[in-house]
UniProtKB/Swiss-Prot annotation:
Gene designation: tmk
Protein's organism: Rickettsia typhi (strain ATCC VR-144 / Wilmington)
Any Pfam family matching the protein: Thymidylate_kin
Enzyme Commission designation: 2.7.4.9
Binding of ATP, residues: 14-21
Function: Phosphorylation of dTMP to form dTDP in both de novo and salvage pathways of dTTP synthesis.
This protein's name: Thymidylate kinase
Record's keyword terms, sorted: ATP-binding, Kinase, Nucleotide biosynthesis, Nucleotide-binding, Transferase
Amino acid sequence: MNKLTQGKFITFEGMDGIGKSTQSKMLYEYLKSQKIPVILTREVGGTFVAEKMREILVHEELLPMSELLQAMAARYDHMVRKIIPALKDGYIVICDRFIDSTACYQGLELENGIDLVYSLHTTLMPSLMPDITFFIDVEPDTAIKRVNSRNMSNKFDRRRIDFYKKIYSCFQELSHRFPERIKTIKASHLNPLEVHELIQKHL
């Protein structure tokens, strides 16, 4: 925790059903308890406009390129209206999903789509990447069981195991591509508190 200073950008990534949102909230509550200025946000969403875009993105069957551009447009609004101002004011920003989710969920559907996602991001906001990303690594079989046990609220929740395996492989690939930024937390056999304690050790 000694290395954690004001104005840092922390993201959580991984498949659905892995406890990613839980860990985002746990870290947020912990930092608040330490009197560290922090905000918690999410993607797709985080602002009024981006949340409206989220409704279309998660419920409508869009063309692959349309879906990617929708996600990027929502992110641009989120970055400009919320993330960047908070960082400039010295806040730690914790975001439940960010650029790596776009690479895996939208980029995989397009030829050379993963590289396209990072290229678009660099064009829109060249100086903004997370300082640290936590990839919550849970095996696809476990993740889909967790998803199936809850109400399926969007089109991604209704996808099958093959889809989850592709997404999982993508996040693994990104963790190897960006090892300085992405920290992998092996969480398949850990409870939420154990995962949280591992995350704290990286801060």
